[in-house]
Amino acid sequence: MTLSFFDQFMSPTYLGIPLIAVALTLPWILFPTPSTRWLNNRLITLQGWFINRFTQQLLLPLNLGGHKWAVLLTSLMLFLITLNMLGLLPYTFTPTTQLSLNMGLAVPLWLATVIIGMRNQPTAALGHLLPEGTPVPLIPVLIIIETISLFIRPLALGVRLTANLTAGHLLIQLIATAAFVLMPIMPTVAILTSIVLFLLTLLEIAVAMIQAYVFVLLLSLYLQENV
């Protein structure tokens, strides 16, 4: 069987059973559980500080009606960061490189924000489809364009996360393969390539965290329009 660079994105199976469910559930074990002690350890304290700062930054532009989403959005943020970071380890599988998973997260959450807007303030929600002061001949065209842009939002959420992580993983694999092949032929070039690989890995770690933040931030912006 001919191997491909895209084989790393295939869902692994064991005895015919897809292991993507294990890849989605096991990362929760890595999160520390708070204890009943007055003083927690450094890891729990750092985790609490991060969640507190992120929640404040996320909910700052939202009114009180959107604050009930704090637990959901914060949990989603930590979940995506964990999956993205664990996928950078060797011989691991990154579930967030699958468009089906990302669309499964993006579509229901986006649809929930739209339903909330239609239920709480239907006039304002429908008003987003037609900007104020639009000339009468352009009204049908603008309504169609705004409707299309509304339905493209979940697709943009899922494709953005998938494309960024897939591109980073492919670059890492290409440069790592080049360094491995060049080592016996041109050791100096191979060492320089390995340095580039190390720097790219650091960049991919930042991308893994930033993309999770962008995913949740865009959801909060969609929520802001409808609460």
From Swiss-Prot:
Keywords assigned: ATP synthesis, CF(0), Hydrogen ion transport, Ion transport, Membrane, Mitochondrion, Mitochondrion inner membrane, Transmembrane, Transmembrane helix, Transport
Location(s) in or outside the cell: Mitochondrion inner membrane
Main location: mitochondrion
Membrane-topology descriptor: Multi-pass membrane protein
Pfam families in the record: ATP-synt_A
Family statement drawn from the similarity comment of this UniProt entry: Belongs to the ATPase A chain family.
Function as written in the Swiss-Prot or TrEMBL entry: Subunit a, of the mitochondrial membrane ATP synthase complex (F(1)F(0) ATP synthase or Complex V) that produces ATP from ADP in the presence of a proton gradient across the membrane which is generated by electron transport complexes of the respiratory chain. ATP synthase complex consist of a soluble F(1) head domain - the catalytic core - and a membrane F(1) domain - the membrane proton channel. These two domains are linked by a central stalk rotating inside the F(1) region and a stationary peripheral stalk.
Name of the protein this chain belongs to: ATP synthase F(0) complex subunit a
The species this protein was found in: Salmo salar
Name of the gene: mt-atp6
